[in-house]
């Protein structure tokens, strides 16, 4: 449901000039995130960041220092992502490649493709732009892999 809401919001932003997300949108997204289906869940704690933080130049202007601290935290989060077959399939499907084909089976690929099509079928809006919505779903599923690769290479 959360993916559908995000896709619909992206379409609204694209199609309606000046569209702004409302407080109600945030509440619905939080509710969906808390109570919705989770699929596979991976929880991991990264090593202590103190050594990395000690390396930062404390004389930087605060906005720059905070940006570097945020980047450090993001890097640790992204490097600890658990990447699943669906993330690899989404990346290859979105980009028209087979770059990560060794990371999933044909059965896993078909399961994920069916899942995406089922999610699209649940979206009930007039003049549904399935290509646009599919792209948004694939972006959501491929982004963890993109972030992981950017942080850990």
Predicted regions: what they are:
Residues 1, 45-47:
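A structural signal for short, well-ordered beta-strand segments
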